């Protein structure tokens, strides 16, 4: 019973520390002005070792315990493990020297596995709220900007965290579709010419379809936003072993002191859902009338050609007469 209480106390203590932990931003690199989120974390592990790795315990520890941690979020170190180095197995013999090649490992009679302590340095990507990061833009829409950090981690900047004086320019999707359809209609006539001129490459319509996007954002100076973009971390989401970052392009002074978000209306703060056609109730009723027309059904007749007459159900009338007679 005391062990259960002790486990509950430890769990509550861990929750309290995690809840009230002070967020500390990572140091800023003076060369590029971004936060250095990659840190070295020395850890000690008590690991098991399979019998097949007794001759080479370092390889066994790496394959069994360290390699599965790489490029995954680890809650104990608070980030994504990028790699490790400096693996050392501690000798169970306290009298042995550190530079000895042979290490004493604990083995019990009930299992063929060995157990030992080891020290290793983990390189962890730990983004914190308030850090300044850079990412390459890979998607732009009216509701957000999607970025890729270090070609591995996703980041998103929502519309509410984009400056008000920025404007999103939509691509004319209908014109691109017309170009594709026109090119497909004329593809039979120009197929041989396109192959000769482009070396067997695809036609213009397919090229337009491959490069079609939702649009792009334009800043206050009218310059399109593309390539690498610098932002501030607003929130870090850890779902399972995957990490995603929410960023903002608005400084704290503009957001708090000047009431930045209050300048947006409630309609602008709502998420944007793009629809090609908005159907109203009147249009729905008209479409239903046109689609649901009366069907011309043939008359059902008996074998001799006479019309079928359905008699009314006389059970109710018989019940009424019987009740009156009673």
UniProtKB/Swiss-Prot annotation:
<feature type="region of interest" description="Disordered">
    <location>
        <begin position="288"/>
        <end position="326"/>
    </location>
</feature>
<dbReference type="InterPro" id="IPR041178">
    <property type="entry name" value="RPA43_OB"/>
</dbReference>
<comment type="subunit">
    <text>Component of the RNA polymerase I (Pol I) complex consisting of 14 subunits: RPA135, RPA190, RPC40, RPA14, RPB5, RPO26, RPA43, RPB8, RPA12, RPB10, RPC19, RPC10, RPA49 and RPA34. The complex is composed of a horseshoe-shaped core containing ten subunits (RPA135, RPA190, RPB5, RPO26, RPB8, RPB10, RPC10, RPA12, RPC19 and RPC40) where RPA135 and RPA190 form the DNA-binding cleft. Outside of the core, RPA14 and RPA43 form the stalk that mediates interactions with transcription initiation factors and newly synthesized RNA. Interacts with RPO26/ABC23 and with the initiation factor RRN3.</text>
</comment>
<feature type="modified residue" description="Phosphoserine">
    <location>
        <position position="269"/>
    </location>
</feature>
<dbReference type="InterPro" id="IPR045113">
    <property type="entry name" value="Rpb7-like"/>
</dbReference>
<dbReference type="GO" id="GO:0006363">
    <property type="term" value="P:termination of RNA polymerase I transcription"/>
</dbReference>
<comment type="function">
    <text>DNA-dependent RNA polymerases catalyze the transcription of DNA into RNA using the four ribonucleoside triphosphates as substrates. Component of RNA polymerase I (Pol I) which synthesizes ribosomal RNA precursors. Besides, RNA polymerase I has intrinsic RNA cleavage activity. Through its association with RRN3 is involved in recruitment of Pol I to rDNA promoters. In vitro, the A13-A43 subcomplex binds single-stranded RNA.</text>
</comment>
<dbReference type="GO" id="GO:0006360">
    <property type="term" value="P:transcription by RNA polymerase I"/>
</dbReference>
<dbReference type="GO" id="GO:0003899">
    <property type="term" value="F:DNA-directed RNA polymerase activity"/>
</dbReference>
<feature type="compositionally biased region" description="Acidic residues">
    <location>
        <begin position="309"/>
        <end position="326"/>
    </location>
</feature>
<keyword id="KW-0597">Phosphoprotein</keyword>
<feature type="modified residue" description="Phosphoserine">
    <location>
        <position position="244"/>
    </location>
</feature>
<dbReference type="GO" id="GO:0006361">
    <property type="term" value="P:transcription initiation at RNA polymerase I promoter"/>
</dbReference>
<feature type="modified residue" description="Phosphoserine">
    <location>
        <position position="251"/>
    </location>
</feature>
<feature type="modified residue" description="Phosphoserine">
    <location>
        <position position="285"/>
    </location>
</feature>
<dbReference type="GO" id="GO:0005736">
    <property type="term" value="C:RNA polymerase I complex"/>
</dbReference>
<dbReference type="InterPro" id="IPR012340">
    <property type="entry name" value="NA-bd_OB-fold"/>
</dbReference>
<dbReference type="GO" id="GO:0006362">
    <property type="term" value="P:transcription elongation by RNA polymerase I"/>
</dbReference>
<dbReference type="GO" id="GO:0005634">
    <property type="term" value="C:nucleus"/>
</dbReference>
<dbReference type="Pfam" id="PF17875">
    <property type="entry name" value="RPA43_OB"/>
</dbReference>
<feature type="modified residue" description="Phosphoserine">
    <location>
        <position position="265"/>
    </location>
</feature>
<dbReference type="InterPro" id="IPR036898">
    <property type="entry name" value="RNA_pol_Rpb7-like_N_sf"/>
</dbReference>
<dbReference type="GO" id="GO:0042790">
    <property type="term" value="P:nucleolar large rRNA transcription by RNA polymerase I"/>
</dbReference>
<feature type="region of interest" description="Disordered">
    <location>
        <begin position="179"/>
        <end position="202"/>
    </location>
</feature>
<keyword id="KW-0539">Nucleus</keyword>
<feature type="compositionally biased region" description="Basic and acidic residues">
    <location>
        <begin position="288"/>
        <end position="304"/>
    </location>
</feature>
<dbReference type="GO" id="GO:0042254">
    <property type="term" value="P:ribosome biogenesis"/>
</dbReference>
<dbReference type="Pfam" id="PF03876">
    <property type="entry name" value="SHS2_Rpb7-N"/>
</dbReference>
<feature type="compositionally biased region" description="Low complexity">
    <location>
        <begin position="182"/>
        <end position="202"/>
    </location>
</feature>
<dbReference type="InterPro" id="IPR005576">
    <property type="entry name" value="Rpb7-like_N"/>
</dbReference>
<comment type="similarity">
    <text>Belongs to the eukaryotic RPA43 RNA polymerase subunit family.</text>
</comment>
<keyword id="KW-0690">Ribosome biogenesis</keyword>
<keyword id="KW-0240">DNA-directed RNA polymerase</keyword>
<protein>
    <recommendedName>
        <fullName>DNA-directed RNA polymerase I subunit RPA43</fullName>
    </recommendedName>
</protein>
<keyword id="KW-0804">Transcription</keyword>
<dbReference type="InterPro" id="IPR041901">
    <property type="entry name" value="RNAP_I_Rpa43_N"/>
</dbReference>
């Amino acid at each position: 019973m005391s062990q259960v209480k002790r486990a509950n106390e430890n769990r509550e203590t861990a929750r309290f520390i995690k809840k009230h932990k002070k967020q500390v931003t990572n140091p800023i690199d003076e060369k590029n002005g971004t936060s250095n989120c990659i840190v070295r974390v020395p850890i000690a592990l008590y690991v098991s070792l399979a019998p097949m790795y007794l001759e080479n315990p370092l390889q066994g520890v790496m394959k069994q315990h360290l390699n599965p941690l790489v490029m995954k979020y680890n809650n104990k170190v608070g980030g994504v493990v990028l790699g490790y180095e400096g693996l050392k197995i501690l000798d169970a013999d306290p009298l042995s020297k550190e530079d000895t090649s042979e290490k004493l490992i604990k083995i019990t009679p009930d299992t063929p596995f060995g157990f030992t302590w080891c020290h290793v340095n983990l390189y962890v990507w730990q983004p914190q709220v308030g850090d300044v990061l850079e990412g390459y833009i890979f998607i732009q829409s009216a509701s957000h900007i999607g970025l890729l950090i270090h070609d591995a981690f996703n980041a998103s900047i929502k519309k509410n965290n984009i400056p008000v004086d920025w404007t999103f320019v939509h691509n004319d999707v209908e014109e691109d579709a017309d170009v594709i359809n026109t090119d497909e209609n004329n593809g039979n006539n120009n197929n041989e010419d396109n192959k000769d001129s482009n070396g067997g490459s695809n036609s213009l319509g397919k090229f337009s379809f491959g490069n079609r996007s939702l649009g792009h954002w334009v800043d206050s100076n009218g310059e399109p936003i593309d390539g690498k973009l610098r932002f501030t971390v607003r929130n870090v989401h850890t779902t399972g072993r995957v990490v995603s970052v929410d960023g903002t392009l608005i400084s704290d002074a503009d957001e708090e002191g000047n009431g930045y978000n209050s300048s947006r209306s409630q309609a602008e703060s709502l998420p944007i859902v793009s629809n090609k056609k908005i159907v109203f109730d009147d249009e729905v009723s008209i479409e239903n009338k046109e689609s649901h027309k009366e069907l011309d059904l043939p008359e059902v007749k008996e074998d001799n050609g006479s019309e079928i007459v359905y008699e009314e159900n006389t059970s109710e009338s018989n019940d009424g007469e019987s009740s009156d007679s009673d």
